[in-house]
Design a protein with these regions (language model features):
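Small/flexible residues
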Residues: 27, 86, 108-109, 195-198, ...
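Intrinsically disordered, low-complexity sequence elements enriched in Ser/Thr/Gly/Pro
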Residues: 13, 21-23, 99, 105, ...
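Short, structured beta-strand/loop micro-motifs enriched in basic residues and often containing a Trp
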Residues: 88-125
Length: 224
């Protein structure tokens, strides 16, 4: 399995084949994977990008190349080990289980909540900053922009979280899927970008998910 950063870079290298689309159902069953209005580029958003990296699925083996969304849903999800003594669930079952509980971890807010509830959340330093805590491959979560904050609060989006990125090798930056919130082609044609974390604002939560499902600090029992 490729590491998180190594996997994330394969999408950056193929960013011109992708288009950022915030539709809430990217990489979901029944979704249209390709954007027929924009040269059939693969649709991607911030959280689907993070899930692909966590699963160690490089671009060349992803549904964007194979066209096999169902195959993606049958993949084992090792970072979600399930309760002790049970086999590792597939990513499809993980998504479905949390969606049924109203905690859709396919989205950034649901994944952030999952990280807090199951021991993956990082503790900031005494000043409340994550700057000295972050390591490459960590996840950073951000609150909705001021123009949309009221909307996120109204719909009770957990912590009003609207975006997630992956901390890059230079920990001042994150690699993330980003772009216009509207369904349109990016002017710069870069669905995957390196963004200075400080330019996005202070993360409201950071987490470290190891691909084998451990936190590195304590043994976590996860109920399925």
């Amino acid at each position: 399995m490729k590491g998180i950063i190594e996997t994330a870079k394969t999408y950056y290298d193929n960013r011109e084949s992708l288009i950022y689309t915030y539709r809430g159902r990217v990489l979901m069953r029944g979704d249209e994977l390709y954007d027929s209005e924009n040269d059939n580029r693969g649709r991607i958003d911030c959280s689907s990008y993070v899930h692909l990296a966590l699963l160690g699925v490089p671009y060349e083996e992803s549904p964007y190349v194979t066209g096999d969304v169902e195959g993606f849903f049958t993949m084992p999800c090792p970072w979600y080990p399930g309760s002790r003594g049970k086999e590792v669930l597939s990513i499809g079952k993980v998504f479905a289980a949390h969606s049924e509980r109203g905690r859709d971890i396919r989205r950034a807010s649901g994944l952030a909540r999952y990280c807090r509830e199951h021991g993956f959340e990082l503790t900031p330093d005494e000043s409340g900053s994550y700057d000295k805590v972050l390591q490459p491959g960590d996840l950073v979560f951000f609150e909705a922009a001021p123009s949309r904050l009221e909307e996120y609060i109204y719909y009770k989006i957990w912590m009003a979280i609207a975006h997630v990125g992956i901390v890059a090798e230079d920990t001042r930056y994150m690699i993330n899927a980003t772009g216009s919130s509207k369904h349109e082609l990016n002017v710069k044609n870069e669905a995957i970008r390196y963004t200075r974390i400080a330019d996005k604002g202070a993360p409201v939560l950071a987490a470290r998910i190891k691909q084998d499902g451990t936190t590195g600090s304590k043994d976590v029992l996860i109920e399925t």
